Amino acid sequence: MAQFDIYESITNKILEQLAQGVIPWQRPWHGGLEGAKSYVTGKPYSLLNQLLLGREGYYLTWKQITDLGGRVKKGCKSNIVVFYKMTKTTETKMVDGEIKEEEKLIPVLRYYTVFHEEDCEGISPKGNKDEKPVSPLTPVEEAEKVVEGYYGREACKLNVELSNRAFYSPSEDSVTVPAMEQYDIVEEYYSTLFHETTHSTGHSSRLNRDMTGHFGSDSYSKEELVAELGAAFLVQKCGMDSAKAFKNSVAYIQSWSKKFKEDKKLIVSAASKAEKAVKFILTGERPTPVK
């Protein structure tokens, strides 16, 4: 029996959605990082797990369901949720002509399974009981709040001008996007701005991602996916309709499907980096380095 490959399983799930014309990182619900939550803790799952679960609401493990006196409805299937477990490993190095062993911690991807609360019987449904109050701000006001907060805090320069180009320049540490009036709808303006803003978090003074890739290279594709994910979740975080914010063609879907088939770890890596980027944009939080 073939050994279970978590990366392959994750990639296949994403590919299945793309084959149906669904872009997993562009969800119809509002709230971005908070669509799917743990029933027990109330905390939202990670960005990657949001993509895998694909359905907002509360989730429980089999044990949590039985501990609450409930059961899973007949025919309902579980969903994979992944997490990183820090594992000790020994690394051999040559130091001053001597072979030395050094212990280090590395993150290893693990998984467990959960069920949506609506697929359970005998437990009290949470529904929308724990939802946060609706923001008094409009989606555009929420988006402007994000933009002003980030560019007011960071040294990155924002250029909004009449042009036909949108790009981030690492050498100048500046984001350039066409003026809002050049877009058919305001959601497209903010999805473009958030895409380039996510790129800017990769600067060496911020999250220090590899920004050296040229168009068509693997490193370029990886960074593009980080920006796509970051933009999609920021748009949703602000309460905008992601279906309006992004123009997706068959070629777009086929392009990403091809990339995922070539690299089964691509979506896992990009989602992790995008989540760090989104948190940095919203809060300035930097990930704690692994020792």
Ranges and model annotations:
Residues 1-291:
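N-terminal accessory/interface modules of nucleic-acid-binding and processing proteins
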